[in-house]
Amino acid sequence: MSDSNLDGVLVLIPARMASTRLPGKPLADICGLPMIVQVAMRAREAAIGRVVVAVDETRVFDAVAAAGFEVVMTRVDHQSGSDRIFEALTKVDPEGKAKIIVNIQGDLPTIDPETVRAALRPLENEAVDIGTLTTEIDNEEDKTAPHIVKIIGSPISGNRLHALYFTRATAPYGQGPLYHHIGLYAYRRAALERFVSLGPSTLEKRESLEQLRALEAGMRIDAEVVDTVPLGVDTPADLEKARRILSAKSN
């Protein structure tokens, strides 16, 4: 995406304190900074546009603000990160200047800024409503693991897929690569507005995959192929790994 279009990009990072596996994880210390601040730093390093953190608790609000990042308070009862970022969008950009909304999960403190930028590339095609990311699965266990979401897509080029379905099953059948979906999204504003206006869809509820709502509504999702899956911090072991990675980079 050209630099001339970056003025219309808004990066929103949802942060939720009530994690079941790692409670309070937005404030977990990683190399002297709260994890949510580390994520905001990676987003700023991507240099694609304005960065705002959407929080649901005053302690997180204060920590993000103290680090010098823009932050907005949102309701605690949102059912999904998409709902939270939409509330944040209406608060921080009510005049509609942002035309593309990038949703970076608040538990990706080690994400490569280039990976963030890659999510924008599918939107170079005006027919695409939502851009996302994927990588080829090279671990045999991951191919059958339900927590690894697979993307079934038609190859558009060597580094992009047109998404036809997302599933926790091992698919598609037969010979050929399987792809791991990475849950980082770049929405056209109109697509996000439509997405949150729709109720949960049949397949979304069956697979517990929010992105299926968009596909069932006829929206187009394309996925850029990247080299690796960013580390999502969901457990104490993940947190220790993130600390090691960022500590090594700072030395």
Curated annotation (Swiss-Prot):
Its EC number is 2.7.7.38. Pfam families: CTP_transf_3. InterPro entries: Cytidylyl_trans, KdsB, Nucleotide-diphossugar_trans. Pathway: Nucleotide-sugar biosynthesis; CMP-3-deoxy-D-manno-octulosonate biosynthesis; CMP-3-deoxy-D-manno-octulosonate from 3-deoxy-D-manno-octulosonate and CTP: step 1/1; Bacterial outer membrane biogenesis; lipopolysaccharide biosynthesis. GO terms for molecular function: 3-deoxy-manno-octulosonate cytidylyltransferase activity. It catalyses: 3-deoxy-alpha-D-manno-oct-2-ulosonate + CTP = CMP-3-deoxy-beta-D-manno-octulosonate + diphosphate. GO terms for cellular component: cytosol. Activates KDO (a required 8-carbon sugar) for incorporation into bacterial lipopolysaccharide in Gram-negative bacteria. This is 3-deoxy-manno-octulosonate cytidylyltransferase. It comes from Rhizobium johnstonii (strain DSM 114642 / LMG 32736 / 3841).
